[in-house]
Amino acid sequence: MKRLGAIIAGGKATRFGSDKAAAMLNGRPLIEHVADGLRSQVDKLIVCGRAWPEMDWIGDYPFPDMGPLGGLNAALHYAQQNGFDEVLTAGCDVVPVAQFPMERPDERAIYIDGHYLFGAWPVALAPVLQEHLRDQDNLSMRGWIAAIDAQAITLTQIFHNLNAPEQLSQYAAQQSNIGIR
C-alpha cells in the first residue's frame, strides 16, 4: 500500500494567537515534530493549507481557508493523481504523532477517537469528499466522519493537542522533566 502523509496546517490558529506550525517546541517548530512522526509511516509527506520551508505543500481544495476538510480534500486529490492508495493525516498541533495500524479489518477510513485529524483515508473517498464539500455549510470534520461511517480506533498512546501557548509551555515542561529534548 502506497501512503501519502499530509500535515493539515491551514488553520487560522485563533485560539493560539499566533502561527501554531511555527511555535517552538524543544528548539524546533511544532510542525517539524509532526513531520518526524509521520515520515516513517508514509512514502511521501506534504503540508496542506500553507507553505513550509523544505517541505512540499499544496493549498486547500477547492478553495483556501476551508479548514481541515479543505486540506484533506486537497490531499486526497493529490494522492489520487499521484498513485497513492491512502492518505494519513495529522494536524500540525498534536504531538506525538500516532503510529497508524498497517492492517485493518475492513476498508473504511479510520481516525483516532477524540483526535479527528489523525486519520487514514482511502483515496477512493476523493470524489465523495468533493461532493460533500459542495454544501458550504458542511465543513465539519465530525460531520464528514459520520457521513462516511469512518471507524474510530482507540490507541493507548496519549496525545497532546496544543491549542494555546500555555498548553505548549506545559507540554514542553513535561518533556523537560522526563529528559526529552
State where each predicted segment sits.
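C-terminal intrinsically disordered extensions
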Residues: 173-181
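Short amphipathic alpha-helices within nucleic acid-binding modules
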Residues: 167-173
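Nucleotide and nucleotide-moiety/phosphate-recognizing core
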Residues: 1-138, 143-158, 165-166, 178-179
